[in-house]
Amino acid sequence: MVNLIESDSIWKRNFNYLFFSRIVKISGDMFAFNSILWFLIYDGKGAIGTALLIAVTFLPEAVLAPVTGPFMKQTTLKFWMYFSDLTRAAIVLIIPLCHFAGFSPLWFVMTLMIVHSATGAAYNPASIALIPQIVNEQGIQKANAVLQSSAQIVRLGAVTLCGAFLTFISPSYTMLIALVLYLVSGFLVLFIKYTAVESQSESAVVTQRGTYIGRLKRGFRLVRKHQILYPLAIYCIFMNFAAAPWEALSAVYVAEDLNGQPIVYSLLKATTAAGAFLLGFVLAKVKVNRYGLLFVTAGIIEGFAFFITGMNTFLPLVFFAAFTFGAAVSAVNVPEYTIIQTSVDSEDQPQVYAVIHMISNISIPAGAVICGYAANAFGSGKVIAVGGIVEIIAGIGILLFTKLAKAERSDLIKEREASVHL
């Protein structure tokens, strides 16, 4: 299943700029989201308020990603990323300024977070599709793993540092740090220079893909008919539905069930990031042949981590489960991105990623709203544990009844060649 990756360096000019832009942007995201999260908690909104925040954070991005995908050409990917960074910078400036002026009702903050989320519909598909343009095919998995592991180290520092700021100063002042980070990230993206990579089989067909509507439909058709991506998308739905209770209720779980302070929540997130970094580092050193098997296995392990976390309040065991959950995150994201980049031609990658992202992430806001009310009735821990059970059962089903876990790298390449003419 795995072999050591050859030592060809991916650290060249374009990847360096992408690398630093991504880690700075992730830092900005951490500061922005956690500041608003604890603002709602301090304001007495509790589980329902945080659940609504999760809903408006994920839903616009998920819905709009397929809509913006057909506009993305290989030559304009970095400009979509730049636009996203500038828009998010504006959002994190408006919220604290209005709060200082005495105007910060919940509906206003939620509206701005909808816009904040919508920009992800451009940034994420563009950044995923950009990697094969600046890294050779043999280095794609390594590039994904390096970005994933480094992102977790940044989260480790950013979440902990943000927790410290939130403990001593207000969330509004903490958000101003995110403003600077978003501006720096957007500035770095502009230095990326590349020539669009287009295969011979692709160039002969790409002009026949039609208008905007045709490209929009093509993205959904590719996912539906793809023997690897279709079960991947289905399992993503269950994975995100299972993750919704943790995403929506983890802060409330720490505050109410564990009687912890914001710094405990931040340390728990930091432990998760450490687990993700460790496995991301390993995946940067070994070459995986069966990405689907790694993806499904990681999902099942993630489900067990949710179950363990929700069923007990013994803090050391909760931290161990958080570390395991973090490791599973890398083991899910790296193969998911690599499967898309390997089994779909470059012109279709932004749209295919956007479609899978939409299909899977629709379950997050729905699950977040449901679990917010369920937590009031049954408790946050039990709801988190139920999410883990859902993910375990779904993973076993995907493992037994689909081709996802059986596919090797050669199968992904065959699917890519077939998809060009679809």
From Swiss-Prot:
InterPro entries according to UniProt: MFS, MFS_trans_sf
Keyword Nuclease: no
GO biological process: response to antibiotic
Annotated localization: Cell membrane
Single GO molecular function: efflux transmembrane transporter activity
SUPFAM superfamilies: MFS general substrate transporter (SSF103473)
Keywords: Cell membrane, Membrane, Transmembrane, Transmembrane helix, Transport
GO cellular component terms attached to this protein's record: plasma membrane
Membrane-traversing stretches: 23-43, 47-67, 90-110, 112-132, 151-171, 172-192, 228-248, 263-283, 291-308, 318-340, 352-372, 381-401
Identification of the protein by name: Uncharacterized MFS-type transporter YvqJ
Organism: Bacillus subtilis (strain 168)
Higher taxonomy: Bacteria, Bacillati, Bacillota, Bacilli, Bacillales
